From Swiss-Prot:
Pfam families: UPF0060. Belongs to the UPF0060 family. GO terms for cellular component: plasma membrane. This is UPF0060 membrane protein Cbei_2176. It is found in: Cell membrane. It is a multi-pass membrane protein. The keyword Metal-binding does not apply. Keywords: Cell membrane, Membrane, Transmembrane, Transmembrane helix. The chain crosses the membrane at residues 7-27, 33-53, 60-80, 85-105. The keyword Transmembrane applies.
């Protein structure tokens, strides 16, 4: 159950980081209202809180290193579903490699 909860926190953090960053991106790059930037900034602050909900035995470095792998995969998915940029085989291979890293860093048994 802890692993499922941990993965859900990673996914939630990814949605907040990518979503908040995207709102700031379209504010500055696409000329949207400054409110997009404000909302994006608030979402990014919330993103910073979510990783603290990870299990207490996971230190900052491990959580953020593993989150990097999740971020890679979620960014590829965001580009595909939101910006209609279809990932190629190298994107998919790289995403799978990143997920293997997440599993090793966060969930490999240590003794």
């Amino acid at each position: 159950m802890e692993i499922i909860k941990s993965i859900l926190y990673f996914i939630l953090a990814g949605i907040f980081e990518i979503g908040g960053g995207y709102l700031i991106w379209i504010w500055l790059r696409d000329g949207k209202s400054y409110l997009y930037g404000v909302i994006g900034a608030v979402i990014l602050i919330l993103y910073g809180i979510i990783p603290t909900l990870q299990p207490s035995n996971a230190d900052f470095g491990k959580v953020y290193a593993a989150y990097g792998g999740i971020f890679i995969v979620m960014s590829i998915l965001w580009g595909w579903k939101i910006d209609n940029i279809v990932p190629d085989k190298f994107d998919l291979i790289g995403g799978c490699i990143a997920l293997v890293g997440v599993i090793v860093i966060m969930y490999a048994p240590r003794g």
